[in-house]
Amino acid sequence: MFIDTHAHIPLDIKESFVNNAIKNNVKVIVNQSEDLKTSYDSVDLANTFNEVFACVGVHPENVKEFKESDLPKFRELLMNKKVVAVGEIGLDYYYGKEDKDLQIKVFREFLKLAEMYDKPVVIHSRDAVMDTINILKEYNVKGIIHCFSGSLEVANIYIKMGFYLGIGGVLTFKNSKLYEVVKNISIDNIVLETDSPFLSPEPYRGKPNESKNIPIIGECLSKHLGISLEEVMNKTTSNAKNIYKL
């Protein structure tokens, strides 16, 4: 079976989304959160579907909505048995650095929670590599670098820190720079993700993504690594189970 380590399940199609995944041998979906509301939604989904597990956290684009008074609510959610990680958290300077200090402050709050509850973290990092690395080094956490798109040098830094690299639909894009990275790292350090409903793999690029597309990403990875799809499935599933303690 496959595991989708990173999805945002649309609530209006949740039943068909999960069923489509199961039909395509994607038997576990780890649903991410972007704020307090979606954290509650994610936990509700996990409580509804055996195949779904939840992460809770605040995405860097939503830090202005975060209130410190929300922390007890996140702590309560983290005690739910189906919450397997803190995420999606991190830093995003793509649109500028005007809220950089606030992003870093909120990022640190959730890294502290991850330490406190012994949970892995799911990291969003865009145009913020060095800040992300330096801050992560201050905490005793491991996890997944979501939608990894950096250089081989950066990949090796994260790997040495104990992180897995989340590889998704971008790998299937023509002229993807990820080709050279995945060829030069071990599959022991890779997990598969869709980031549904975003970043659909070819030939569905531009259409809403679903967890059912994980095997397409796996097939692409198997070709680049020169190994069987079954080996990709078994190893990435084992990696996902290891980091999420499934």
Predicted regions span which residues?
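Mid-domain alpha/beta scaffold segments of enzyme catalytic cores
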Residues: 1-246
